[in-house]
A protein has these predicted regions:
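S-adenosyl-L-methionine
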Residues: 1-170
Length: 170
């Protein structure tokens, strides 16, 4: 159980179960139906909640004095988050993974640091331009391998799979 912000689990990737989920103290204060009602829908379909898609989540506070400024993670479908996190939903899974790849780059991080902004609200995140067509299969393979380790990401792997991944080396 988490009681302090310093309470972390030491994890060995080799021994984690395939369906591992990190622990959390977050519990919605409403029932499941109300939570679903409060969940926003994607802009391209008023009947699909954002939680039906893999999303790219960002720590809202930009760490201007830290080693990394823009901190992001890929959320699998079905997961929500608290208001200190912002997330973007993409129509196509490869766009989400591609944007995640750019967000881990030194170039994007430097840009975010150079703005001096304290928070990464959705309007700021939408300013970040990413030329998806310039990414190589290696970028996609590495982003998926570093972010999507459990069965919760199986659908994302299927949607983004490229046979070129088989020839990638580290």
């Amino acid at each position: 159980e988490c009681e302090l912000n310093s309470d972390y689990d030491v994890l060995a990737l080799e021994s984690l179960p395939d369906d591992y989920l990190p622990r959390t103290n977050y519990v919605p204060i409403c029932d499941e139906a109300e939570y679903a009602r409060r969940t926003p829908n994607v802009p391209w379909n008023a009947h699909l909640p954002v939680t039906r898609f893999s999303r790219l989540a960002f720590r809202r506070q930009l760490s201007q004095s830290g080693e990394r400024t823009l901190i992001s993670s890929i959320l699998p479908p079905g997961f929500g988050h608290i208001n200190t996190v912002n997330s973007l939903t993409f129509r196509k899974s490869n766009a989400a993974v591609g944007f995640a790849s750019f967000c881990t780059s030194v170039v994007f991080d430097f840009f975010c640091k150079s703005t001096g902004r304290a928070d990464a609200y959705e309007s700021f995140l939408r300013e970040l331009v990413f030329p998806l067509e310039r990414l190589t299969p290696a970028s996609f393979a590495r982003t998926l391998a570093l972010n999507c380790l459990t069965t919760h990401y199986a659908e994302l792997w299927r949607e983004c799979w490229n046979e070129a991944f088989r020839t990638e080396t580290w």
